[in-house]
Each structure stands twice: as C-alpha cells, then as structure tokens.
Amino acid sequence: MKVTNLSEKEERGGELTEAEKEELRKSEKGAIIELLVPVDTYLSAGVHIGTHSCTKYMESFVYRVRAEGLYVLDVRKIDERLRIAAKFLSRYDPQDIIVVASRPYAYRPVQKFAEVVGSRALVGRIIPGTFTNPYLSTYIEPKVLLVSDPRTDTQAIKEAAKVGIPIVAFADTDAKIDYIDLIIPANNKGRKSLALLYWALARQILRERRVIPPDGDLAVPVSEFEMRLVQ
C-alpha cells in the first residue's frame, strides 16, 4: 500500500550539536556504549523527535526540551528499551505475537516486521471483539500484543487488557500509557522513524532467538520497512 497527502512528522527540529551526539554515545558514567544502531542513523531517521507536549509517564525518557517547546527523546533509552522488548518478545512463539497499526505510516513497517519475525500483523481498523469474542470469524488469541501508537491503537489495547494479554508499545512523548506493560519511547509518527524502529526490533529479536548471530544483520534492508509514498 502507498500513502500520500498524510501529515508526517519529518526529521526537522530535532537537530543535535556534535557535543550532544557525542554525549549520546556514552553512558551516564561516561563509558562508550554500543548501540543497536549508530547514533547518527537513529538521528537521521528522527526516532528521537517527540511532540510539543509530554505526559508525566514519558518524562523520564526525555533528553531535552528545545526552545520552541519540542521534546527530544534520549536515543540511549530508546535503544535500551528496544533491547528489553526484543528479549521479552523473543520468548514467545512468533505466531503468538500480534502487531497492530492504525496509523497508515506504520502499515508497511508492521507487515514487514511480521514477515521477518514470523508473527501476525493487523493493520487498519480492529474489528471489535477480535481478541474477546470467540464467535467472530476474525477472532484470534494472541499471547502478547505489540502496538505502534497507544493513542490510535486503542481498540486493540482495550481488548488485550480485558483478557490479560501483555502489551508492548512504541510511545511518543504525548502518549498515555494506560494498560501498557512495556514502553519503547520513540517517534511513532514519522515514516523513516517507524521503518528503522521495526527493523531494529525485528533484527534484535532474531538475534535473541539465535536465528542470526549476535552481530548478524537482516537480509531485508531498512528501506523495505518504509511506507512508500505516491509521487
């Protein structure tokens, strides 16, 4: 599916100085840390760009606030949560993982993630009762749910919470995290950001499962995870 005429949060306004980039390559104690993705790659995709509002739940993931009020996420914490989420999700049978996306820019990343990992993808509107009504033809029983945006994937979240399914979510600075069990702070609105996030998470899950070596890469490039635009 291709998308056009949609407002995308581009990777503008979140530029960092070289000193700040260098700081993000180090732990709080000053030691160089090895990220899943180089700092410059994270930044060029805009994974760190938040919104102009921040809920109390997301404050601990903020790196700084720009003069115009834009909240900027800490890529070290994004990276850390990607690792934690990958380790957690790798414990499940792939077919028991459902990944959902109501926001169009997340459709292709979610579908490619499911293809690579072996999980199941649900994009677009979630039919009420999908997780709760066994009489529906669309009824499924996942063991864990991965959502692209708590603000738009509300139907899936409510149903998963009702039946006790653990929920992992990509959450921007404006997110309300009711029912979310594991947060991955990130720009979940940008096309390039979503592609990189789902690609990095898929790769790390395969590493955790030992499908690929600890330093192995996916056969599928990040570009294949990116939602295509109509010219």
UniProtKB/Swiss-Prot annotation:
One annotated Gene Ontology cellular component of this protein: cytosolic small ribosomal subunit
Pfam families to which the protein is assigned, alphabetical: Ribosomal_S2 (PF00318)
UniProt keyword list: Ribonucleoprotein, Ribosomal protein
SUPFAM superfamilies reported for this sequence: Ribosomal protein S2
Keyword Manganese: no
Example of a GO biological process term: translation
Tagged with keyword ATP-binding: no
GO molecular function: structural constituent of ribosome
Gene3D superfamilies: Glucose-6-phosphate isomerase like protein, domain 1 (3.40.50.10490)
InterPro entries named in the record: Ribosomal_uS2, Ribosomal_uS2_arc, Ribosomal_uS2_CS, Ribosomal_uS2_euk/arc, Ribosomal_uS2_flav_dom_sf
Compositionally biased residues, Basic and acidic residues: 7-23
Segments for region (Disordered): 1-23
Family: Belongs to the universal ribosomal protein uS2 family.
Name of this protein: Small ribosomal subunit protein uS2
Name of the gene this protein is made from: rps2
